[in-house]
Amino acid sequence: NFYASWTDDSFSITAGSFYDQFGSGLLLRAWEDRALGINNALLGARFTYNYKSYLRFKAIWGQPRFGMGYTSTQVRGADLALSLSDIFRWDSALLSLEGSALSKYEKFAEGESLELQEAGIKPATNGYSLRVNAEVAGFFLKGEYVGSGKKHFTNPYYATGESSKRYLKKDGNAQLIELGYNGYGLGVNASFRRLEWMESKIQSGSNLTSNLMNYVPGMCAQYTYLLSNLHPYSPEIGRIIPGASNFMNSGEIGGQIDVFYNFRKRSALGGKRGLKIHGNFSTYYTIAEEGTVKGGTLLYRNFNVDVEKRFTSKFKGQFLYSLQEYNPTYGMDDEMLVSNIFVADLLYKWSDDLSTRLELQYLASKDDSKDWMAALLEVNFAPKWSAWGSDMYNHGDSKTHYYNVGLSYTKSRTRVSLGYGRYRQGFLCSGGVCRVMPAYTGANFSVLTSF
């Protein structure tokens, strides 16, 4: 990326390529995640203005990046935030009102222009976002309503002759509410989200993860362990599957509750070195009827609890249990894959320079590929070297081993790693966003540096 920027106390102007987002990103997010192959930076200009701490204004114009180049799609938008708590000098509370407006213009492809115009579909899509943020005495509340504009989709019933309309027009919208409490070692966060036709593409015609112009992460527990990530949840943002079923799902509705508690040292349960407990429950359904909050078919349900305990100054353990229910048909029917997952993560520090970490995992299931077991051993020679080896074995069905060994070296701000192994087809996830990874056996080499 490249840019030139000028900033003073109240104004800033940026010209070039830049990243930004409106609100939570449901309406717009220009960002980069190299693990997922996402980089939809905007090439254009951005202007910001701040009036004391009372008001923040931002206007952008740009062409999103897709793949290795910038597209002809044009994005224009503005964002405004008003801090009522600063205006009225509320020292013990925070209250802000925010709003955004966005317009995306994508020129019709040759050969489609006339048909789309006759169907009443326009090249410009206009959206908006309204938000409120409040905090007082450790409690917080966030609310957002997004209207992402009119979308068009190919009508699966047109090809079968059941409909004379070649295209379907849908209104995209989303609602997000988060509330919680943090204080005295306790953290509670409850979220509700409803998504309906929230797919927002940079360019029509491509279903790649990197083609999205907004940010819609999975709002559920995010796992890093091998077996707990066999079926990660990816949100439903509107799906049409043509074919024998001509299945159509407008989105999802659901939420999660996340609870954390830190038992203090020398308390009854904390013991000599304390104890940390974390639990999460999340559930999501299809939308039974468009334009309503009525839930339909179960898509995903997860319950997990993990406990972290330091036994000695050198030995620490983390123990996880997860119950996952996953619908592999995207809600076409009520089939569910159920898994019970157990993980022990043990870390021992032999000296200031040498530590080892051992993961032992087991997945029990009567569905899909049945039972799995996995183990990982990691040896760290601080601060430069790290080596690891792992094996994930499907002993309940295919009897296949998925092994991996690797080595990394870190110096200053640069990390070089080399790994070799067999990888199953699945998903690679980062920050609640996932993309499909093909099965392969081979080597991976990476260099990560910061300037």
Descriptions of predicted regions:
Residues 1, 33-373, 377, 383-399, ...:
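Signature for the C-terminal beta-barrel architecture of outer-membrane proteins
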Residues 1-8, 12-14:
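N-terminal cofactor/phosphate-binding cores enriched in small/glycine residues
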Residues 1, 18-24, 30-32:
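Acidic, small-polar-rich N-terminal luminal/periplasmic segments of exported/outer-membrane proteins
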Residues 412-414:
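A contiguous, mid-protein "functional segment" used to position or interact
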